[in-house]
């Protein structure tokens, strides 16, 4: 796994293609080779590795075990870029900006492009909840 680095670029509010980074887990004596194409972010690495080790994952963090989580759970990705934060779910992106601004977009992963769409109040609320909860847990020292 890697990080997108300092040169995140693009015309988009959140240039998603610069965040696409593969994760490789190599343990040939313990894990059969396979490719898993699922939405996951760096916050999912620890619970995924713990799941591979057969260990429980109970923590106040937002990551999930990307290999063993129930398929019914909808996966989300959280982003921070410049002064904006965003949440992505099922190719629907909501960008939350300064001054309570927001923008709802549909992401086309093949064309790597966005199309504006009607406000998605549910996804916007979920994004606000994730970021506000994380901020509150951090500010009040409850991340342990």
Language-model-detected regions and their locations in the chain:
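Solvent-exposed soluble domains appended to multi-pass membrane proteins
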Residues: 1-144
């Amino acid at each position: 796994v890697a990080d997108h680095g300092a040169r995140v670029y693009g015309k988009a509010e959140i240039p998603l293609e610069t965040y696409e980074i593969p994760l490789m887990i190599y343990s040939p004596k313990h894990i059969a080779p396979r490719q898993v194409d699922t939405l996951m972010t760096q916050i999912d690495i620890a619970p995924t590795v713990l799941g591979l080790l057969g260990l429980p994952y109970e923590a106040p963090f937002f990551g999930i075990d990307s290999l063993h989580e129930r398929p019914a759970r909808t996966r989300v990705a959280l982003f921070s870029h410049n002064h904006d934060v965003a949440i992505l779910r099922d190719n629907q992106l909501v960008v939350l900006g300064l001054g309570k601004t927001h923008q709802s977009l549909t992401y086309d992963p093949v064309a790597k492009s966005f199309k504006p769409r009607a406000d998605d109040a549910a996804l916007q609320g979920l994004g606000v909840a994730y970021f506000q909860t994380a901020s509150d847990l951090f500010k009040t020292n409850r991340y342990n």
